[in-house]
């Protein structure tokens, strides 16, 4: 990959947007910033670039999403599935049909949002389910490994619980801190970034503090209902991006 001014600026903007999402919603919507990166690099290179950056973003975000914002009962059920899913994703990375996974995840996500809209588009409160949490963790682990999009399975489990906006964001933040730290080494083994990618990575670290802080300020200015509606809206954006990636992959 050639390191040009355009590459640096576009990548910096993409990383800033991802950090903004982590500050505002805790995690899970990183895919929103990936289209910017795809303008200047291929998806595999972007994956290698983001793997270490995600760790730095997550650790910085935990300055805002402290232990008091973590839903520990949910994390206790979710995290083992997450690590297991990442393991499956790594072992099957070269054999899985990433396009089919993207399309299936997009369809499931759009159905989930459609059902929420039909039900009145309000914050709900449903009981916890350990089997659902484990399933969501595994699905998130696989999709975050193969498509950097582990957000939808987690959101489909957490949003119906009606957690407070801070607890929702804090729980997703810690969830993806663990997930991104777990998948960093497998991704670097698969991709092996070049010198230019490491240089670009170092430059993009500068976007992290401002991006996370700006997102956190937005989070503080919105109420529970607004945050949840934005999360559902971002799920639609994420699903459409996954659908495009999957369908266009078959057309190439």
Label each PLM-derived region with a short phrase.
Residues 1-40, 122-172:
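Selected transmembrane alpha-helices and immediately adjacent juxtamembrane segments
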Residues 39-44, 63-72, 159-167, 191-194:
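Juxtamembrane helix-boundary/capping and inter-helix hinge elements in multi-pass membrane proteins
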Residues 46, 87-93, 142-149, 183-186, ...:
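Hydrophobic alpha-helical transmembrane segments in multi-pass integral membrane proteins
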Residues 49-98, 181-225:
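Selective hydrophobic functional segments
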């Amino acid at each position: 990959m050639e390191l040009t001014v355009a590459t640096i600026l576009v990548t910096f903007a993409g990383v800033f947007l991802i950090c903004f999402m982590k500050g505002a919603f805790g995690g899970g919507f990183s895919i929103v910033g990936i289209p910017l990166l795809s303008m200047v690099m291929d998806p595999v290179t972007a994956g290698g670039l983001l793997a270490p950056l995600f760790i730095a973003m997550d650790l910085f975000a935990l300055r805002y999403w402290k232990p008091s914002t973590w839903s520990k009962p949910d994390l206790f059920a979710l995290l083992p599935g997450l690590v297991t899913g990442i393991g499956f994703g790594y072992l099957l990375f070269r054999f899985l049909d990433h396009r089919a996974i993207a399309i299936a995840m997009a369809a499931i996500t759009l159905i989930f949002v459609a059902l929420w809209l039909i039900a009145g588009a309000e914050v709900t409160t449903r009981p916890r389910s350990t089997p659902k949490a484990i399933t969501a963790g595994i699905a998130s682990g696989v999709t975050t490994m193969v498509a950097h999009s582990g957000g939808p399975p987690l959101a489909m489990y957490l949003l119906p619980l009606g957690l407070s906006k801070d607890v929702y964001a804090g729980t997703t933040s810690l969830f993806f801190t663990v997930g991104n730290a777990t998948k960093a080494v497998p991704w670097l083994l698969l991709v092996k970034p070049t010198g230019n990618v490491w240089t670009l990575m170092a430059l993009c670290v500068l976007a992290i503090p401002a991006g996370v802080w700006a997102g956190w300020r937005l989070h503080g200015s919105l109420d529970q209902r607004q945050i949840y509606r934005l999360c559902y809206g971002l799920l639609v954006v994420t699903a459409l991006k996954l659908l495009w990636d999957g369908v266009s992959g078959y057309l190439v």
